[in-house]
Amino acid sequence: MIETDKLFGAAPERRIVTPQRASEQEEALERALRPKLLDEYVGQKKAREQLEIFIEAAKKRGEALDHVLLFGPPGLGKTTLAHIVAREMGVNLRQTSGPVLERAGDLAALLTNLEPHDVLFIDEIHRLSPVVEEILYPALEDYQIDIMIGEGPAARSVKIDLPPFTLVGATTRAGMLTNPLRDRFGIVARLEFYNAEELTRIVSRSAGLLNVQLSDDGAFEVAKRSRGTPRIANRLLRRVRDYAEVKSDGVVTMAVADAALAMLDVDPAGLDVMDRKLLQAILEKFSGGPVGLDNVAAAIGESTDTIEDVIEPFLIQQGYLQRTPRGRMATAQAYLHFGLPVKDA
């Protein structure tokens, strides 16, 4: 049997390896560590090369960059790339998110204040309301918006011309975008999980910016437990630094990193409390699956959205979990991770 006391004792909101942003303070720290230019950006080779070419071409023609859609799991650098696009183009960036744009007027106010070639970044673009999305279509295609002035019989439509601009949309759920919206993006890039070597470079770079003394094997130890996600790698680095300063001589070696991450309940495979909790529920409560998502959510006390967007992608990518037409199933690798005999097919 798997020990469950520790697994079920940690609250999801305290999860250190979540790729979601935890606080305004952490977001400020992330901004300080972000690369500013494409040359500084590590990983995502395909997306980076595409953007390099399209940005250079747009600059040579003196045009706004075509609209860009960035999608993939959270924490992989979509916001960072949006800022880099604006900086490489030499223009301003205006940032908002889908849930914030509740009314058509909210979007119209942003669009009418853009300067030529500016970048408008909409995070969680899949959460735009249909009313706001309708306003966005002509803005993206013709650089125009139609807004209603007045109410009732006296209401009239006014067409407003916009300067050429670039929309950068980011989403963790590309499948939830409507076809008309998706089709208006000329550049579409999927961001993938990072490998350990790429994350080691990111951890080493961040350590330099934070003045952390870090050995090469210490950097790799942090990187390989970071779930393929730079945001998590930087968060773990800060916690390992704290541990090194209090429990050691301030130098993050492999041994120090291992001890610090063990204290944080991040195991050698990079799985944390919630990962193990989800896998344990499927293995023990549902005999390894298949089991429906709603049942898994009820068993571990998490929302289905959090499971699908935050917990599952890494487990699937690493081969611990399968999504099948009949439901979620633990793989042989999951059984072996917990020292359990593999279930016969």
UniProtKB/Swiss-Prot annotation:
Binding-site positions, ATP: 33-34, 75, 78-80, 141-143, 184, 194, 231
Top-level class of the enzyme under EC nomenclature: hydrolase
Keyword DNA damage part of the UniProt annotation: yes
Residues holding Mg(2+): 79
Residues covered by region (Head domain (RuvB-H)): 268-345
Annotated GO biological process: DNA recombination; DNA repair
Annotated segments matching region Small ATPAse domain (RuvB-S): 195-265
Gene Ontology molecular function: ATP binding; ATP hydrolysis activity; four-way junction DNA binding; four-way junction helicase activity
One Pfam family from the record: AAA_lid_4
Keyword annotations from UniProtKB, A to Z: ATP-binding, Cytoplasm, DNA damage, DNA recombination, DNA repair, DNA-binding, Hydrolase, Nucleotide-binding
Binding sites annotated in the UniProt record for DNA: 323, 328
Keyword DNA repair: yes
Gene3D superfamilies: 1.10.8.60, P-loop containing nucleotide triphosphate hydrolases (3.40.50.300), Winged helix-like DNA-binding domain superfamily/Winged helix DNA-binding domain (1.10.10.10)
Chemical reaction(s) catalysed: ATP + H2O = ADP + phosphate + H(+)
Enzyme Commission number(s) from the entry: 3.6.4.-
Region (Large ATPase domain (RuvB-L)): 4-194
Localization: Cytoplasm
GO cellular component: a single term: Holliday junction resolvase complex
Biological function: The RuvA-RuvB-RuvC complex processes Holliday junction (HJ) DNA during genetic recombination and DNA repair, while the RuvA-RuvB complex plays an important role in the rescue of blocked DNA replication forks via replication fork reversal (RFR). RuvA specifically binds to HJ cruciform DNA, conferring on it an open structure. The RuvB hexamer acts as an ATP-dependent pump, pulling dsDNA into and through the RuvAB complex. RuvB forms 2 homohexamers on either side of HJ DNA bound by 1 or 2 RuvA tetramers; 4 subunits per hexamer contact DNA at a time.
Quaternary state and interactors: Homohexamer. Forms an RuvA(8)-RuvB(12)-Holliday junction (HJ) complex. HJ DNA is sandwiched between 2 RuvA tetramers; dsDNA enters through RuvA and exits via RuvB. An RuvB hexamer assembles on each DNA strand where it exits the tetramer. Each RuvB hexamer is contacted by two RuvA subunits (via domain III) on 2 adjacent RuvB subunits; this complex drives branch migration. In the full resolvosome a probable DNA-RuvA(4)-RuvB(12)-RuvC(2) complex forms which resolves the HJ.
Family annotation (PANTHER family): HOLLIDAY JUNCTION BRANCH MIGRATION COMPLEX SUBUNIT RUVB (PTHR42848:SF1), PTHR42848
Family, as annotated: Belongs to the RuvB family.
Domain remark from Swiss-Prot or TrEMBL: Has 3 domains, the large (RuvB-L) and small ATPase (RuvB-S) domains and the C-terminal head (RuvB-H) domain. The head domain binds DNA, while the ATPase domains jointly bind ATP, ADP or are empty depending on the state of the subunit in the translocation cycle. During a single DNA translocation step the structure of each domain remains the same, but their relative positions change.
UniProt protein name: Holliday junction branch migration complex subunit RuvB
Naturally occurring in which organism (per UniProt): Chromobacterium violaceum (strain ATCC 12472 / DSM 30191 / JCM 1249 / CCUG 213 / NBRC 12614 / NCIMB 9131 / NCTC 9757 / MK)
